[in-house]
Each structure stands twice: as structure tokens, then as C-alpha cells.
Amino acid sequence: PALLKLGIAKVVVQSGAGEAAGFPDDAYVDKGATIGSADDAWAADLVTAVRVLDADPQSPDLARVRPGQVIVGMAAPLAAPEVAGALAAKGATLYSLELVPRTTRAQAMDVLSSQANIAGYQAVLLAAEALPKVFPMLTTSAGTMSPARVLVIGAGVAGLSAIATSRRLGAVVEAYHVRDAAKEEVQSLGARV
């Protein structure tokens, strides 16, 4: 309904688009969207995607792109310039969100911070699952198990998230970053530099 109030006549969401993130099709319908096929979604004048063409210039979705279409999402144009080139060759306009500067003014469009935050969190959970011991120190009748020791290299958004998650799981955390200014952020999360 909010988009309809802005004059956007119709919002089509590809069936299953939000399933991996825990958003069923009904959640989009409840907000006024229509559920459709990939063809229905790509028929729009404005297409948004988390990963445009899955960063693959050979994606079958490329055949659905048409001249004048505007595509907004993450396309990795610096790492995979062939995707941007393929879209340009089709006459489409690409707004690659990972190139939006991280400024206060553009903060509402900052997709990298949220993605990096999740990546740091998930990295620790995957490491905790693979580690043959538990993260926190445990004292049992059989003895005491020392806490896991975690080294986080890099204290950007993902690194800070990894530090915070490791600490919450009970690990002893050390971090390294090339910026001296990161020292205070790392220490505020309870890690050593």
C-alpha cells in the first residue's frame, strides 16, 4: 500500500524470492505485491534484485532484460564488469548498490554494511560449528574446558560483527586491523588488539 500511494501501480515479486531470507510469498502479498513468475518480475520497467543476474553474464535472466529497463541491485561491476557490459549492451540502466558511497546522506541505500554485518555473524557461527570444542569456558564435574580463542583479521563492519558474535558465544577474542582508529572499536566490543 505505501508504494501504491507513491504512484507505483504494481509491484511484482518473483515466487519464492524471499524464502531463503525467511519471507514467504504471503508476506509480500500482505503488503500489496503480486506474486508472479520470473518472466512477470523481469517484465517490469524497474527491477530490483539482491544479486543482479547472480553476477553471471551468462545468466538466463539476461534474455529477459530489455532496452530502457532500470535494474537496481548488487552486480559486482568492478569484480565482474562483464555483467554491467551485458546489461549496457541490452540498453538497460544498472544502479549497482555496492558502489553507493557510505555517507550519512546515502545511508538508507547502504547495502554493504548490512550484508557485511550478516557475513561476520554467519562466519562465526560456521566456525563454531566446525570447531571440535565449544566456544565458552565450561566447568563440569569432569574438569574445566578453556574457552575458544578467536582471531579476527580486519575490523570493518564484518570483522566487528564477528568480534561481537564471538564474544557473545563466550570466546576469547583478539583482532588485528591496519587502521589505528579501529583499536577503540575493537576494545569496546571486548576484544584485544
Each language-model region and where it sits:
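An N-terminal-biased, well-structured beta-alpha scaffold segment characteristic
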Residues: 1-86, 90
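Short secondary-structure transition/capping segments
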Residues: 23-26, 48-50, 106-110, 186-188
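Glycine-rich phosphate/diphosphate-binding loop of Rossmann-like nucleotide-binding domains
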Residues: 1-23, 133-193
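Short, hinge-like loop/turn segments at secondary-structure boundaries
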Residues: 28-32, 112-115, 190-193
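Conserved active-site and cofactor/substrate-binding residues in soluble primary-metabolism enzymes
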Residues: 23, 42, 66, 78, ...
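Glycine/serine-rich phosphate-binding loop and adjoining beta1-alpha1 elements at the start
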Residues: 55-149
